[in-house]
Amino acid sequence: MNWRFVELLYFLFVWGRISVQPSRQEPAGTDQHVSKEFDWLISDRGPFHHSRSYLSFVERHRQGFTTRYKIYREFARWKVRNTAIERRDLVRHPVPLMPEFQRSIRLLGRRPTTQQFIDTIIKKYGTHLLISATLGGEEALTMYMDKSRLDRKSGNATQSVEALHQLASSYFVDRDGTMRRLHEIQISTGAIKVTETRTGPLGCNSYDNLDSVSSVLLQSTESKLHLQGLQIIFPQYLQEKFVQSALSYIMCNGEGEYVCQNSQCRCQCAEEFPQCNCPITDIQIMEFTLANMAKAWTEAYKDLENSDEFKSFMKRLPSNHFLTIGSIHQHWGNDWDLQSRYKLLQSATEAQRQKIQRTARKLFGLSVRCRHNPNHQLPRERTIQQWLARVQSLLYCNENGFWGTFLESQRSCVCHGSTTLCQRPIPCIIGGNNSCAMCSLANISLCGSCNKGYKLYRGRCEPQNVDSERSEQFISFETDLDFQDLELKYLLQKMDSRLYVHTTFISNEIRLDTFFDPRWRKRMSLTLKSNKNRMDFIHMVIGMSMRICQMRNSSLDPMFFVYVNPFSGSHSEGWNMPFGEFGYPRWEKIRLQNSQCYNWTLLLGNRWKTFFETVHIYLRSRTRLPTLRNETGQGPVDLSDPSKRQFYIKISDVQVFGYSLRFNADLLRSAVQQVNQSYTQGGQFYSSSSVMLLMLDIRDRINRLAPPVAPGKPQLDLFSCMLKHRLKLTNSEIIRVNHALDLYNTEILKQSDQMTAKLC
């Protein structure tokens, strides 16, 4: 039989019944993404992924156009059925197949391999047959939109998308006018790409204004596409193997066998394709997409900072005084324009966060059987507290082209880029009590005027009625030895006699200029015994020095614990020097020339100088070594044993540096009695206001010399220690005096009390 005649018969069997339907018009606007759930399993396979529309959408999506809107109308449709496949009895009436297809089936044999099926059948003819479908023509307008660009151009992406939808809906009414306006928007914004297509079906009489003449498979709710596996036309013994081969081709790209066990399916990779389970191309696309989403997240924050609402908010902030986080928050909440812009940012970042999470879940799901481990971190949302801190940094840490981060607790900037030029002058704090009433016009960091009851002194506000010269009659806080820190360091290096304080060395465990074993705790004290010898003075420590000699090749490094009693008392009434903490200095170790001796120096300076009566020094080595203890605990040790003597050290000199302040105990005791008397008489503060102010000033100046403490903890109360040990007051008298001063400070002066911790 002639082959052309056989082909005509087969065509008549396949395209059975034809019916003509009127044309229709459908708009379709959807947010479509390249990868849907399980879409990677069939990526780059089948006719759909090689179609013109899909490839166009993939390319647009990679360019940033994540939203597709399509309005189209179909016309001249025919419903077709494959009547040959509908036959139930394929044995008596076999399907008329092409000779080439029949020859390919015969070449398979009875037990073909998966690769034979793929190369011979699947790659040539596919995996499915068309059972029924709809043919026709289509006229469509497709818009690809980048919502992020629309948001930046118009300020509201939702309204812009709706306006474009309304404009596109008039395409079939006024095609030329609609296309002209859309092209103007495309050129001016770059946020949309417009494509129009007109495809006609085979058999139409008129092909005018058509881009192509070909059959179009239409698919809608009314016109569904029905497919069936190609195995139905194979012999019985080949059907199961064909299904396995088709699944291996679709799911594993022909690089392995598709197997299912325990409700889990995977690809059993061939030796030449060990990574067949890993869709590396899709993973790279998702990683690139996540990187772009992270950039878009950062750009959203920059867009808010560059917006007109944020800039106008920054301009309206007052610059004549310091703004705390709380005051900035108040201005932030009162700016309605900024609030509406901030809500848009929150909604945009929330939508972006959900997209990132969905993409990240897909990415990690694809990487389950990959050697490639994805590294992705979800961008952190900037909280309102971080926004306020950002505003503060823009106000005070944005100078000379540099920028940094502002720390409100320290009122300073941490500049980025290893520079200190980003900090602007920090304005003064305006408030009540000892805060400024107005900042200085000449130097905004200093006070220009003070509140009632305070006077301006060196840019600070101090209580107006305090006579500092009168308090000097009680304790001479200001002396000729108030040197600068550099001067003090120079005088300590020279061992200046003016800073030499005569103390008494006391120790039952150590003798000066005698070697001892430091691996056991040793204690020594330096005391003044002012209550017996120098009752008219209190003493200030500004530094310490020790000369320690070690045996040759010694590996020990001694460690010191120093406790200070400010005004005598027991050991429990002392405080420990926090070396290296809270800005407190450390010991400086300098080796002496041509000797095994070292000078250990501690310079407190003006910042950390404090009162002292007795200094307790505990010495211990930094390493634990085998027990070699001097049983006597005193006297010279045996240095003849080389295994022992390398651990011994000796202290040849211990010295405290400082100066003494004149202290009028009788005059101060009489002032304290007046304070105590006013408290017991029912708070008659007005009659003794000068004494109250004087005692408040003395208490403040004494407690100001207290040692540093951890942030959030109260300072030590040195004033009460002075009342107890130098004025010999009882605990009840000390409580009454402090309570009277606190009442006067809060009720009369309207100042807040500073919390202190009990030491004595």
From Swiss-Prot:
Matching SMART domains: MACPF (SM00457)
GO CC, any one term: glutamatergic synapse
Keyword check for Cell cycle: yes
Protein name: BMP/retinoic acid-inducible neural-specific protein 1
Glycosylation, residue list: 156, 433, 443, 553, 599, 630, 676
Signal peptide location: 1-16
Function in brief: Plays a role in neurogenesis, brain development, and the functioning of GABAergic neurons. May suppress cell cycle progression in postmitotic neurons by inhibiting G1/S transition.
Span of domain MACPF: 68-251
Keyword annotations: Cell cycle, Cytoplasm, Glycoprotein, Growth arrest, Neurogenesis, Signal
InterPro entries associated with the record: BRINP, MACPF
Similarity comment text for this entry: Belongs to the BRINP family.
Induction note: Up-regulated upon differentiation into neuronal cells in the presence of retinoic acid and BDNF. Up-regulated upon differentiation into astroglial cells.
GO biological process: behavioral fear response; brain development; cell population proliferation; cellular response to retinoic acid; central nervous system neuron development; exploration behavior; gene expression; homeostasis of number of cells within a tissue
Tissue expression profile of the protein: Expressed in brain. Expressed in GABAergic neurons of the pre-frontal cortex. Weakly expressed in embryonic stem (ES) cells and in ES-derived neural stem cells (NSCs).
Gene that this polypeptide is encoded by: Brinp1
Pfam family membership, one: BRINP
Subcellular location: Cytoplasm
Coiled-coil intervals, chain numbering: none
Main location: cytoplasm
